[in-house]
Design a protein with these regions (language model features):
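Bulky hydrophobic/aromatic content
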Residues: 1-67
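Loop-centered beta-sheet repeat module
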Residues: 53-97
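Short beta-strand segments
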Residues: 75-77, 102-106, 149, 180
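A structural signal for short hydrophobic beta-strand segments in well-ordered beta-sheet cores
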Residues: 84, 114, 172-173
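Short, charged/polar surface micro-motifs in flexible loops or helix N-caps
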Residues: 87-91, 98-100, 117-121, 155-159
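Flexible linker/loop signature enriched in Pro/Ser/Thr and Pro/Gly
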Residues: 99-132
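Polybasic (Lys/Arg-rich)
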Residues: 131-189
Length: 189
């Protein structure tokens, strides 16, 4: 299950892919511009997308070697992949850990190895990736209840938020002390 999978199948994704192919072709023809067009680097981990997507499709657990930022050594374990999510140019895997008996988020750029196992699993019938992350900013989902969070910023920054919202729950509210204000319904993190 890939978050926003409907977009992957729809015209929106086809249009995006055609645009990317067109731009890629144009860039190949204009190699002299490579010092004038700058791309944001994508962290490591994209090589694990294909096996993870295959495991999601076939409902097979994966064995991965993973090293979180807080660990001095990587460890190897088996998880059941539930969904992939991209946030701020990084891919994340939400997966159920049978050993810890809970779902956890793993950053693909911290994976060292991924192997599809023969072990089958069932995705819970009530699992909905969009609902799971609905009140999260990024990939941080807390066990606490989401809260209404209000921020007040200067007009220059407000223009950015109006054109590129930080979260789907974002709403512009009444100004606070003359400054634009925005509310969000999120897990406090």
């Amino acid at each position: 299950y890939i978050e926003e999978a409907a977009d992957l199948r729809g015209a929106n994704m086809r249009t995006r892919m055609l645009n990317l192919m067109s731009i890629n072709s144009l860039l190949k023809d204009c190699k002299e511009l490579n010092r004038q067009i700058l791309f944001e680097p994508v962290p490591a981990g994209e090589q694990f997308l294909a096996p993870i997507i295959e495991a999601l499709r076939d409902k097979h657990a994966i064995q991965m070697t993973y090293q979180g930022f807080d660990k001095t050594h990587p460890s190897t374990f088996v998880v059941e992949p539930y969904c992939l999510k991209m946030f701020k140019q990084r891919w994340y895997l939400l997966a159920y850990s049978p050993v810890k008996d809970k779902t956890l988020v793993y950053a693909l750029d911290r994976m060292h190895e991924v192997e599809i196992t023969k072990q089958k699993y069932e995705l819970p019938n009530d699992f909905d990736a969009e609902h799971y992350f609905k009140n999260a900013y990024g990939v941080t989902v807390l066990e606490s209840q989401p809260e209404r969070i209000i921020i007040s910023i200067d007009e220059g920054q407000a223009k950015y938020l109006r054109t590129l919202p930080l979260h789907p729950s974002q709403k512009e509210t009444e100004p606070i002390n003359g400054y634009p204000a925005f509310s969000f319904y999120l897990y406090p993190s």
